[in-house]
């Protein structure tokens, strides 16, 4: 098992951003994480990325108990095990695409322009290597970010709303890259409000008020996926209280995060 969370809580005063969450992610799985704003998705990603620590519970990543590691060891995991992709591009404006990828190489104490160029080629941007971010479309900028995240050949890629700022065409280009990574055995955890993006994962989980309240598996059949809902009605105490239930959670433009994806309008 690549990732194991056991009874993890993250508490800020009276707020339980994560509330007794247990989760296992096998090596090579594509996991989609959905839920309304404030459900704990980003907190979960920060803890898995070694950028935050749980108040209670334990997290094991790649066989190591994160709570027992010192700062240098956590930095080593961030450098060598994890690749991060965010909704915001965070590219350095005065550096070219290939130089932005090489920034990650500096973090790994090595620079190799040839490898950085190969990373851009792998995301379809070989002909944009010398372009500044201002000369790239939003989709191209996001693909530079993906190339940068993959430069350390991570075992797990964490993507927080990676297509949130993209139109349908560029969204599909990013999803195609993720599909290739998945086929190569890379573990993916993707936070999204988009039901189409979520449906690309092998498995979807639904968070509500920091708790896991729904799960859905997808089985590939010659490129087509059929889905089975698991334990969706087995909600923890409080999920049916004053807040919304798992079945009722809605994003801004999707009626059912774990339902069938609706056709997406061109943006």
Question: Model regions: which residues?
Answer:
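Compositionally biased regions
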Residues: 7, 33, 38-40, 138, ...
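Short, solvent-exposed coil/turn linker segments
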Residues: 65, 129-132, 217, 225, ...
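Conserved beta-strand-loop-alpha-helix hinge in the C-terminal portion
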Residues: 211-237
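Long, low-complexity, intrinsically disordered segments
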Residues: 247-267
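Short, low-complexity interaction segments enriched in Ser/Thr/Pro/Gly
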Residues: 7, 232, 245-247, 261
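ABC family nucleotide-binding domain
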Residues: 1-204, 209
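N-terminal compositionally biased, intrinsically disordered segments and leader/signal-like regions
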Residues: 193, 227-229, 245-246
């Amino acid at each position: 098992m690549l990732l194991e969370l056991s009874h993890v809580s993250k508490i800020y005063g009276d707020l339980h951003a994560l509330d007794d969450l247990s989760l296992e992610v096998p090596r090579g799985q594509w996991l989609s994480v959905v839920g309304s704003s404030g459900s704990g998705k980003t907190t979960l990603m920060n803890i898995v990325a070694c950028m935050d620590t749980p108040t209670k519970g334990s997290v094991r990543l790649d066989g190591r108990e994160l709570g027992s590691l010192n700062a240098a060891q956590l930095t080593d995991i961030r450098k060598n095990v994890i690749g991060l992709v965010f909704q915001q591009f965070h590219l350095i404006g005065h550096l070219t695409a290939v130089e932005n990828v090489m920034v990650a190489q500096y973090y790994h104490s090595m620079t190799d322009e040839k490898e950085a160029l190969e990373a851009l080629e792998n995301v379809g941007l070989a002909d944009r290597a010398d372009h500044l971010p201002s000369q790239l479309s939003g989709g191209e900028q996001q693909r530079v970010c993906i190339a940068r995240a993959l430069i350390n050949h991570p075992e797990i890629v964490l993507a927080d709303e990676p297509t949130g700022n993209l139109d349908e065409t560029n969204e599909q280009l990013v999803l195609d890259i993720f599909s290739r990574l998945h086929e190569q055995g890379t573990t993916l955890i993707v936070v999204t409000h988009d039901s189409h993006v979520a449906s690309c994962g092998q498995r979807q989980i639904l968070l509500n008020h920091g708790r896991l309240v729904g799960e859905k598996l997808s089985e590939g059949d010659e490129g087509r996926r059929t889905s089975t809902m698991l334990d969706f009605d087995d909600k923890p105490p409080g999920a049916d209280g004053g807040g919304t239930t798992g079945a009722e959670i809605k994003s801004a433009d999707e009626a059912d995060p774990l339902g069938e994806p609706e056709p997406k309008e061109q943006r």
